[in-house]
Amino acid sequence: MQSESPIHGRLFELSPDECWERAGSRPVGRLAWTGPHGRPAVIPVNFTVVDGSVHIRTAAYSQAARECDDSPVAFEIDTFDEAERSGWSVLMRGHAHLDFASPPGDHDPEVWADGTRTLQLRIEVEEITGRQIHHGG
């Protein structure tokens, strides 16, 4: 049995509302899906959160556009502080769909990478979970 130590953190589950709040606070997340031949794929992307869905700008020739449309995907957002040994992680699961339209309102994600991204990959989130760790001290 392991004893309590100040170097260990306390892990807490986040509520769905807390998960959505944290997800909307970061500019980059990780899109994950099962690619060809059952091989996992994970890429970092810029995104926005709008009305219970995740919006990602992508190019028609991108791996995500070719492999994610009408498919189950996962999306992960996190942040951490190594010095404080603290952070949080939010995981979303759902289905991705390609759209030509922009997200409603002024919610188009700012894309850091160059190139033309005329498509929107929209993830309809079916499940959202999260955890937060605080330093035990």
Predicted regions and their residues:
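Extreme N-terminal tail/first-helix region
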Residues: 1-24
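N-terminal short leaders/motifs
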Residues: 1-5, 46-49, 74-79
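A generic local structural motif
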Residues: 15-18, 41-43, 60-62, 107-109
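A generic structural motif
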Residues: 49-51, 100, 129
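General beta-strand recognition
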Residues: 53-55, 122, 129
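Short, structured beta-strand-loop surface elements
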Residues: 60-119, 125-127
